[in-house]
Each structure stands twice: as C-alpha cells, then as structure tokens.
Amino acid sequence: IYEPDPEPGRATLTGEPSLGTRCGYRKRGSSSGGFSKYAMALESWNEFNEDVDIKPLGFSAEGDWILNSRFTFDQSLMRNPFLYALSNQIDRWAVKTQFIEIFHDATGGDITASDYFGVYTFMEKIEPDKGRLDIPSVNAWDNSEPDVTGGYVFKRDRSGVGEQSLNAAGSGGAVPLTSPNIISTPQRDYIQGYLAEMNSALNAPNGISSTGKHFSEYMDVGAWIDNFWLNILAMDPDWGRLSQYFYKERNGPVSAGPIWDYDRTMGSDDSRDDNPRQWDTGNPTWYASNYPWFGKLFGFKSNNQPTPAASSTRPDVMQQVVDRWFELRAAEFGQSNMETIINGMADEIREAQARSFARWRNPAPGSISGQNFSEAGTTGWERDVSHLKGWLKARSEWIDQQFFLPPTFNKNGGVVEEGFQLTMNSNDATVYYMTDGSDPRAPGGGTAIGAIPFDVGPIDEVLLAADSSCQYFVPLDASLQTTWFLPEFEDTDWFSGTSGLGFESLNGPLNSHITTNIKTTIMPSAT
C-alpha cells in the first residue's frame, strides 16, 4: 500500500510502501463476482499463512478487508461510500471506506501498467469488533446467560459460502448467520427462540407476546426506523430481502443494520431505481411477505402505499417514522449536507476516475439509464455525480410531500429580544400546541387533553404579576392526571396563597423569592 505524501498530496510507486503484507484474496459478490472488474475479499497473512492484523490507511487493526469495485450500475463510483458516510453521521454504524487505485497482477510476473485495475473502495467487513461493529463476540463456550444473549450478526440474504442459516420465525426467507461462524446448539436455541418471541409480539394486535413483553423490548425501534429511511432514501430495490443485516447485542434488543450494498440505488444504471418519485421499486416499501418484519413493526399487513401514515394499525410507531424523517431532513438528510459529502468524495477521485474509466468502459461514464437529474452541460463522470445529487434532491422532496409537513417557526428557540412574538406556519393543517412542554398528540393519534389549536398569528403569552393570588394542591397519588387542565375543573378545596410559590428550606437561597413556601405542606415534619 502506497499512501500519498502529505506535502505534494501524491503517492509514488518508486519509494517505500506505507505497508506491505502477505495476503490471500478471493472474488466476492453473489451477483457481481463474475464481472471483469471484480470485488475481492482480502485476508492479511504472516509468513505462516496465518491471519495477522494490519492497520492500513488509518483504519483500526484487523485482518479481514474488502476491495469493493464498481464495474457497472454505479458510474459515480461513490454510492456505497456516500450512504455509509450518511449512516455514520446519524450514529448508525456503517463500515469505514477509503478510495484507492489498484494494480492487480493475477497471472504472475512483474507489475506493469497493464495490471492497473482502476478505482476501488477499500473498506471494512461487518463483524463484531471494538474497532468495527462494537458488540461482544459469541464464543464457543458462551452457552448460558448472559453470554449466550449476544452478540449475533445475521442477515436476510442469499446464503454465503460456509454460512449457517437460522430458522427465524416470520422472516420471510433465508436468514444466514454471519457471526459467530460456528454456532452451538444452546446458542442456536437461544437466538431462534428470541426471534420467535419477537415475531409473536409483532403479530399480536397489542404488540405483546405470550411472554408479556412488548415488541419494543425485543427490537431497537429507533434503529429499525433509521435503517428503513436510509434504504428508502436510496430507493434500494433489494432492501429488506437481500443484504439486509441485523444484529443483537448482549442483553440487548435486535437492531436493523448495518446498511450494506447500494450500487444499484439512487438513480443507478439498474433501472428499477430510475424514478425517485414513487415508493416501490418492484418490491413493496411498506409491507412484503418475503421481508415482513419491517411492515409488521409499522402496522401493515399489506402494502398500503398511497397513504401509509393513515393506513397503519400502529399510529404511534408510524408517527415516529414520520417525525424521524423530518428530523433527518432538517440535518443529515438535508440537501446541503448530502451534497457536501458527495462533493468531498468527488474531489478525492476526480483525477483517478479518468484513469479508471480508461481501463473499464462498461458502460461509459455519463450514460444515465432513466430520467436525467444532472445539471445541464455536465458530461461524462461529472454528469454521473451531478445526476446523483439531483436524484437525491428529487427523492427527498417527493418523500416530504407524502406526509403532513411539520409546522415551522419564525425562531427555533434560544434567546429572544424583548417584545418578540412567536409565529408558526401551519401549512394548511390544524396544529395543536401545549404550553407545559407535553405532547399535544395523545397516544393512538388523538388530541391530548388541554391541547390548544393554533390560529395563524402570534401565540399569546399571559404574564402574571409577581404577587398574584394562587391556589395549590399537593397530590398523594396520580388520580388527578390531567383533569386539572380543564376549564371546568373545580379547585375550591385547594390551598390559597400568594406567588411566588415554591419549596425551600428555612435559610435557603430562594427564600427571598418565595412568598408561599409549600415545604411543610409536602413534608409536614420539615423545618
């Protein structure tokens, strides 16, 4: 491995390499292994052909690596690295990547210019490790709790060479186990039993299995939602049924992820992802019988795509799905951030891509299979990069339009000047708000008690004089709940006092601000 010299920013093949190692490699990829420019799995070896850890290109020490190629479908050369970077930005671990150029002598002899193999992505494998997917490994002797509970890595995919499969209830198909490599009978019984209970909870109308546990105790719902949106943003034709990873931490729930394999997405040359302004890619988005866990979690038994938020039988989960989309759109999924990632990657390979495409032209860069979203006047590889950015813009804006847009404020919090009036844009929908910090949406999707409908204009704020009279009550249980919010609530039996109202000890620092001290009301024996 030759790394660029920091000063000129270039690597030269006449000096000493940054790292040299023996290694073994094999072609990889269930559908791409037969390409002329093939991907490779790499193992670093010592002189005895034993695995040895190396630290190349600033990565953590490990012995298993991937040289990921792009021969067709992704002419930008960056769809995988882009989405992995986006996933890491939202704190969902994905493999780290680095663009490289390869000389590959597959026949023996001296390395010459004819051995140039083009631009590749050097990347990690998905495996438990402190420098990678940071969950404990399951060892052969981990056959009782808590050690038997994790970590496991499995996927919905075709089975790979030497991989064992789990009998996972409700998965819709094969579930190869990628870690541990060899599983004991107690370990298999544990993880299959856990997944069966999870599926039972998903099938139950109330979300509770026969064990009394809710599906949210079996699944990291937030991780499943983030994995869903990464896949749906990319419009992955294979998501959920191929290259769909899951992992279970020790004493923890099942998470969806890490994400994997996105060369046939985001307006690639695959054609199934040409149109960013639709949900489905030939495979359903919201429910599919061959990958039903996501659909069941979101409250679907069929692919109710026209109005998914309204069709769900789990409106609270679907509200989390919608809220998370707009949260991501305001930050990492914003067009500016996505283009910053793409532009940075494009700068890295702008010179190298020309050499790579001179070696491999299948198809030639700039040949877009569907609708063109690139800027006018761009050509070749620059057109592919521009198309990727334009496609993502069209995709994310279309998804925005499938849900009620959240209200916007003339200021999103912080210090304001005296006299400031808060206004809110309700986007032609009825918006409710609360003034006590609670959610105006009740569980199940109704309007919470005390929620105030917003009328266009400033929100009035009522200020009370410092010495206003007040009434107060110290509850002994939760029977009041929120009934005291209601205008008709009867409070004549409450104590009377003068504000400020507070709780403070005899010589406490807030005594000068408190006129009615309720400490002895709450704690009769207090002084």
Task: Indicate where each model-derived feature is located.
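Conserved NTP-binding catalytic cores of kinases and kinase-like/nucleotidyltransferase enzymes
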Residues: I1-F82
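Active-site acidic catalytic loop and adjacent metal/ATP-binding pocket
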Residues: L42, E217-N275
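ATP-dependent phospho-/nucleotidyl transfer catalytic cores
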Residues: D53-P56, S69-R70, F122-A234, T285
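Short, well-structured beta-strand/strand-turn elements
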Residues: N88-F103, D236
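C-terminal catalytic region of ATP-dependent kinase domains
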Residues: Q192, N199, N251-F403
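Short, compositionally stereotyped local motifs that mark structural "simplifiers"
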Residues: Q371-S468
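Accessory carbohydrate-binding/adhesion or oligomerization-edge regions at the termini
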Residues: D455-P509
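Short beta-strands within extracellular/lumenal beta-sheet-rich domains
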Residues: M523-T527
